[in-house]
Each structure stands twice: as structure tokens, then as C-alpha cells.
């Protein structure tokens, strides 16, 4: 589970900003909201970020996704850019390094992974583990500008042979993380496997607002041989007042014509998948059919006739099932997209009531109705705000000193928590 993530000099974030899943002293719904990662240490399962348009909410999620990419991606060569973008709205920051750090738990051990980099190089990278109260260095990497080379100091407690250390060092070019180089190296199993696998398998990419999730739903249903997922989806949709009796996945094979082959060749598809398609000489088209009950009869509707909201919420149901059955970290941008507020609240409530593992969600939203709900803990709420210089600042609701009897919703509406968007006159002179 992620305990804390800090960012400095990344897109609209200039000074150090931090998101934390460590709970406050509040005991309200502690069992539902938190999970004990080790004796005496609990972490929150949910974080919710509010903010005006262009205040930097999405940049926080993108920073976590970029952090994951640093851990896993092996550059093509030493000249490939890292992809990092610093704060560009002053002359100093755009020439300074970006810093990122994450505190997370794997199997009751606390890890701290930190990077310092610019567009061309990773200047430092450190991985520390706390198996007890004392920190243990697993490795520390540094860049020497004079020789244009990277040096890695591996910790004794990593218990890795010198030969394996040399293999990883040889694969760690200046724009590549040690963990990414490790992922491409044939070396013995160590704690690096646990860290690499955590990011590869448990930290998911950002779910963007434009994703209707149709393809994701189809792929999950196609693998649902026992029918457990389908049963969960139908129960969830019925409880959410959708008049849907069944969802059926239909498959139809289509021969690849010369015209279709040309489209496949130019499509942004994985090379191996593309080659397999062309080898078979046919492709499989899938479509969802929804069975709606109207009175005493049931009618079939194909997915093209379903609303964006229905398709989005169907996808959210599949994601919810995924979160409850596996241990994952899922960031969702503008979670309320195409979804009625009551459905959003229900989605969060079901997750909290049924989550018994280490799954976490970090959500961004514009829907301030959640601030008026009794079931929302204040330490799960964060606000982003941009100052007059274009810099994003992040603040936690529980740190603002709002009295427990005062409504966060009313305080937000009155501009007492963060600045609200300043709106001019609704009358416009069309002749100007």
C-alpha cells in the first residue's frame, strides 16, 4: 500500500507537495477506511482530491503514473529523454531537477524509493527498507557528470552477488532507473523483485475521464469462465437501480481482407498481437448486448444504444470487483464523469464496506456533494489550488482546523477552505 507520495518541480507543481494515506487520529469508521499494514501502522484505502479546473489535480495522478514508468520502463538507448517536465513558469525551475519520493508497504516492510532527475539524466535514486525500526539501504545510485556515467552502491543487506550487481550496473544507463535495469537482468531473487512486482502488478495507470471502459469490460468478461464477475456486475447494477437483467458478450469472426490488413498494419497495436492476427487471417469482433426488462418482457439492446453513463458505470463495476478481489492501487481522474452523484457515493460506500485487503483508490472530482456526506472522513479529502504564479499547492481538509460541527460543504462553498474560481459578469458584449 502507498503511505505517502511527494513531488517537487513537476508540471504545475513547483515546491514540494505531498499526498498521504496515513490517517489522522480520527477513529470514525476506522475499520472501513483503513487497513493495518503492520502492527501499529494503518493506511487509508481512499483519497479524494478536489480543485478548480486547471488547478493541478490531474498532475498529481500523472506524477504517480510517471513514477511507475520510471520504475519499469527501459529506454531504447542512452539518448532517449526521460519524459519529465519541470515547472515552466519561472526561469529557475525549468532548469532545475525534478524530485519524487514514495513511501509504500510490501509484506509489512516499509520502503522509501526516491528519484532526482531532469530530461536527460537520473542524478540520484535511492531505495531504503525498514524491516525493523532502523532503515536499511538496498541501493543508492549517483550520476557523475565528469565521466557521464552512473555508479550504484548496493547495500550488504540486499544479499545480491557481486556478479549480479555488475550485470545491473552495466544495464543502468544514465536515463534508466536501477529497477528498470534489474527488470531486464538475469539475476537472483532479492527484495528488488518485490518492489519491481509491486509497481508492475499492483500500481495501475490513471483511468482518464474519456474512457468508457467497453474494451476493458469485454476482456474481463471473456476471462470470466466461472461467471463470478458477471454475477457481481448484475447485482451491482440492480442495486444501483439499472433496469438491466443481463449482459451478454457476443463474439463474431471476420476474415481479413486486403483493405482490413492495411488498417491492421497501420494500427497502434502491439507487434506480436498484430503478427498473430495476420497469421490467423481473421479477427474476432466482440459486442455487448444488454437485456432490459420492460413490464413482463425482456428486450435486447446492443451497446451502441446504451448511454455513456451506463457504459462508464458498467466499467466502474468491473473495476470495483477487481479492487475487492485483488490488491491494487487505482487512480481515477474525474471519477464522477457521466455518473450521477448517488451512484458515485454508492460506488465508494460499496468499496469501503467490502474491501478487506490492501486495495486503494486515489480519486479526483469536481462533485462537491461528497463534502456534505456523513460517511466521508476529513483526512481522505485534499484540495488543489493554484496561486497567482501558476503553482499548484495541495492541502488536506483535516489540517485546516475546521470545527467538527461545521460543514465542509458549506465552508467550501463560502471559499473558506480554498479559493473558488472567480467568475466575471455573465453578460458579454458581442460587439467587442
Feature roles, as predicted:
Residues 1-4, 326, 346-432:
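C-terminal lobe/lid and adjacent interdomain/linker elements of RecA-like ASCE P-loop ATPase modules
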Residues 41-42, 93-95, 105-107, 321-324, ...:
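Conserved catalytic network of the ASCE P-loop NTPase/AAA+ motor domain
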Residues 34-48, 52, 61-113, 118-122:
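Conserved P-loop NTP-binding catalytic core
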Residues 2-66, 432:
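Pre-Walker A-like glycine/lysine-rich segment at the N-terminus of P-loop NTPase domains
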Residues 46-50, 265-321, 329, 335-339:
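Conserved ABC ATPase signature
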Residues 10, 334-339, 368:
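Conserved Walker B
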Residues 112-258:
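Electropositive, glycine-dotted interaction segments
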Residues 340-345:
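Short alpha-helix of the ABC ATPase nucleotide-binding domain corresponding to the H-loop/switch region
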Amino acid at each position: 500500500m502507498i503511505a505517502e507520495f511527494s513531488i517537487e518541480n513537476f508540471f504545475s507543481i513547483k515546491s514540494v507537495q505531498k499526498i498521504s494515506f496515513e490517517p489522522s487520529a480520527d477513529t470514525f469508521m476506522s475499520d472501513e477506511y483503513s487497513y493495518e499494514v503492520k502492527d501499529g501502522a494503518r493506511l487509508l484505502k481512499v483519497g479524494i482530491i478536489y480543485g478548480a479546473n486547471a488547478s493541478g489535480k490531474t498532475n498529481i495522478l500523472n506524477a504517480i503514473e510517471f513514477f511507475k514508468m520510471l520504475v519499469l520502463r527501459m529506454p531504447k538507448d542512452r539518448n532517449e529523454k526521460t519524459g519529465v517536465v519541470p515547472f515552466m513558469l519561472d526561469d529557475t525551475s525549468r532548469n532545475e531537477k525534478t524530485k519524487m519520493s514514495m513511501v509504500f508497504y510490501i509484506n509489512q516492510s516499509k520502503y522509501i524509493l526516491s528519484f532526482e532527475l531532469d530530461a536527460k539524466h537520473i542524478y540520484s535514486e535511492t531505495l531504503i527498507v525498514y524491516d525493523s525500526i532502523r532503515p536499511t539501504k538496498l541501493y543508492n545510485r549517483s550520476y557523475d557528470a565528469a565521466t557521464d556515467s552512473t555508479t550504484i552502491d548496493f547495500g550488504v543487506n540486499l544479499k545480491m552477488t557481486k556478479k549480479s550487481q555488475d550485470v545491473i550496473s552495466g544495464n543502468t544507463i544514465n536515463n534508466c532507473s536501477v529497477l528498470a535495469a534489474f527488470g531486464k537482468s538475469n539475476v537472483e531473487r532479492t527484495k528488488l523483485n518485490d518492489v519491481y512486482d509491486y509497481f508492475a502488478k499492483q500500481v495501475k495507470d490513471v483511468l482518464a475521464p474519456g474512457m468508457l471502459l467497453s474494451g476493458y469490460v469485454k476482456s474481463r468478461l471473456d476471462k470470466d469462465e466461472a461467471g463470478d464477475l458477471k454475477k457481481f456486475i448484475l447485482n451491482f447494477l440492480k442495486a444501483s437501480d439499472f433496469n438491466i437483467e443481463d449482459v451478454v458478450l457476443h463474439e463474431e469472426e471476420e476474415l481479413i481482407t486486403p483493405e482490413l490488413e492495411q488498417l491492421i498494419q497501420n494500427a497502434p497495436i502491439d507487434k506480436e498481437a498484430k503478427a498473430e492476427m495476420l497469421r490467423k487471417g481473421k479477427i474476432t469482433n466482440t459486442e455487448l448486448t444488454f437485456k432490459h426488462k420492460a413490464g413482463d418482457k425482456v428486450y435486447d439492446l446492443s451497446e451502441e444504444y446504451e448511454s455513456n453513463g451506463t457504459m462508464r458505470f458498467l466499467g466502474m463495476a468491473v473495476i470495483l470487483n477487481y479492487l475487492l478481489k485483488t490488491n491494487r492501487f487505482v487512480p481515477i481522474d474525474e471519477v464522477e464523469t457521466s455518473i450521477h452523484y448517488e451512484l458515485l457515493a454508492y460506488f465508494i460506500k460499496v468499496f469501503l464496506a467490502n474491501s478487506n485487503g490492501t486495495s486503494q483508490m486515489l480519486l479526483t472530482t469536481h462533485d462537491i456533494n461528497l463534502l456534505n456526506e456523513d460517511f466521508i472522513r476529513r483526512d481522505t479529502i485534499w484540495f488543489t489550488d493554484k496561486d497567482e504564479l501558476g503553482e499548484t499547492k495541495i492541502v488536506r481538509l483535516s489540517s485546516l482546523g475546521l470545527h467538527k460541527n461545521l460543514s465542509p460543504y458549506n465552508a467550501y462553498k463560502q471559499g473558506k477552505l480554498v479559493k473558488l474560481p472567480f467568475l466575471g459578469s455573465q453578460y458579454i458584449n458581442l460587439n467587442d
